């Protein structure tokens, strides 16, 4: 999980830029990086269980789509998600936290990367990084849970 | 393009309930503004703009503060379980000092 955790560390650093560093650019990169930290955490875990070569796994990682991952997350939040096993696994609260943060961070990332009219403040970046950290903690608790495995395989 | 499927009365009720949630956090929340719109890929969305007191921002760990407010909004408004669940909720925060400096009309 090195890249995901490294990205989270970087996002945290960017959320509190040193004096003289460009604040707006730092906050934007912090939020965007926090999203990608969580994205890569989920994608890497999803492909870990896939029995292919490392080259094939890297190829598989590139197939994950942001929009579909958002749709799966939203269905988890609205209790409409169904896994592929019967009966469908119960969704743990930790997975709902991860889903909620994923959806929120994806929207924030879009704004941070593309909405140049928006002015960001320190609390924006610190809040989103804290959310990403919360999602990491929750994911680490349930990463082997059947619901976690199945929702990743649907993305 | 319509930004909401809700009737004027539903919108009024929704706004009132948002204010009621804000009142549950008198020491932490200055006010909560919201708007219905579309998110980055066109899904219906509610954007909450939550202005927190400087004191609360300093007194509480940020995840605890924002978590309590978001849980209050999600639970009291039924954001994932009611007719509002068609909208994806997004939460943004600012301190009063930030807003006094930026004077952003959407947050007034």
Language-model features and meaning:
Chain A
Residues 1-155:
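Terminal alpha-helical segments
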């Amino acid at each position: 999980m090195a890249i995901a955790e490294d990205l989270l560390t970087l996002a945290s650093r960017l959320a509190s830029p040193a004096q003289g560093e460009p604040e707006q650019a730092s906050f934007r990169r912090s939020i965007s990086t926090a999203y990608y930290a969580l994205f890569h955490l989920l994608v890497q875990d999803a492909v870990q269980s896939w029995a292919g070569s490392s080259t094939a796994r890297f190829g598989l990682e590139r197939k994950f789509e942001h929009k579909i991952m958002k749709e799966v997350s939203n269905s988890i939040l609205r209790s409409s998600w169904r896994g592929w096993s019967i009966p469908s696994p119960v969704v743990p609260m930790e997975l709902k936290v991860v889903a909620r943060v994923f959806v929120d961070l994806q929207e924030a990332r879009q704004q941070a990367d593309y909405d140049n009219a928006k002015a960001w403040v320190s609390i924006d970046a610190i809040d989103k990084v804290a959310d990403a950290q919360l999602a990491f903690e929750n994911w680490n608790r349930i990463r082997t849970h059947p619901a976690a495995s199945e929702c990743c395989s649907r993305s | 393009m319509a930004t909401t499927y809700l009737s004027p009365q539903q919108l009024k009720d929704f706004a009132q309930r948002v204010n009621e949630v804000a009142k549950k956090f008198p020491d932490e929340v200055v006010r909560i503004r919201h708007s219905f719109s579309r998110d980055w890929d066109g899904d219906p969305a509610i954007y909450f703009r939550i202005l927190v007191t400087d004191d609360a921002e300093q007194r509480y760990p940020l995840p605890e503060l924002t978590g309590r407010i978001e849980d209050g909004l999600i639970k009291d408004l039924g954001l994932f379980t009611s007719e509002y669940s068609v909208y994806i909720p997004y939460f943004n925060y600012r301190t009063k000092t930030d807003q006094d400096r930026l004077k952003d009309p959407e947050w007034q």
